[in-house]
């Protein structure tokens, strides 16, 4: 995978450089993942649908033979932070709202298809270092593209089912988002060291979370 995105190209051959703003980079990771997911689906003869903004999930996968057995895929990302001693702090991800489709009686709020049609929910998660040289967006000529720096480095990722990495507390800040486990070891996410043993256990907890 070529992670070295450095900007957005216009028809007039100008490059708008990328800042390390987390909202921008979350969209970038989704863009990078989409062709890979699409290729997998084409090879398996699966259908792939994208959700709209603020709708769960980002990608819905299913077979025409079993349209009521859908797979949800969401892309999540965060950046590394270190303490004064240079040690990596624990990190976490937000895993979508618990007040929409999970707590909706019909399971149809804020979701592409009714929640009951999804048999699996997967997270592709990324963690990266922010490039301090990419704090702001600038405009450069296309001839300078090879000298531009990407806004991130040291990218690592995991792929895991949501219930296996979900925690028991909401995401940070004034949100209604499910919070993941917290760890400074990405292998805890890769191996799914969350507190829930089954998807049903996870759903029961968050359907009743206040």
Enumerate the language-model features and the residues they cover:
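Anionic group-transfer/hydrolysis microenvironments
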Residues: 60, 76
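Nucleic-acid endonuclease domains
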Residues: 1-55, 65-68, 77-210
């Amino acid at each position: 995978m070529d992670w070295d995105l450095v900007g957005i190209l216009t028809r007039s051959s100008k490059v708008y450089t990328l800042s390390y703003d987390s909202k921008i980079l979350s969209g970038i990771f989704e863009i990078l993942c989409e062709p890979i997911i699409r290729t997998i689906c084409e090879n398996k003869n699966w259908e792939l649908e994208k959700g709209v903004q603020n709708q769960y999930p980002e990608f819905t996968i299913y077979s025409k033979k079993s349209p009521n057995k859908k797979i949800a895929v969401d892309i999540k990302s965060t950046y590394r932070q270190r303490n004064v001693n240079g040690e990596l702090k624990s990190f976490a991800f937000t895993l979508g709202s618990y007040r929409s489709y999970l707590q909706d009686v019909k399971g149809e709020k804020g979701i592409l298809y009714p929640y009951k049609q999804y048999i699996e929910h997967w997270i592709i998660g990324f963690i990266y270092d922010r490039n301090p040289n990419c704090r702001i967006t600038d405009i450069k000529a296309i001839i300078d593209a090879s000298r531009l720096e990407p806004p991130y480095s040291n990218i690592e990722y995991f792929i895991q089912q949501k219930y296996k990495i979900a925690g028991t507390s909401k995401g940070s800040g004034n949100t209604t988002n499910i919070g993941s486990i917290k760890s400074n070891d990405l292998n805890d996410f890769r191996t799914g060291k969350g507190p829930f043993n089954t998807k049903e256990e996870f759903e029961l907890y968050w359907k009743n979370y206040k």
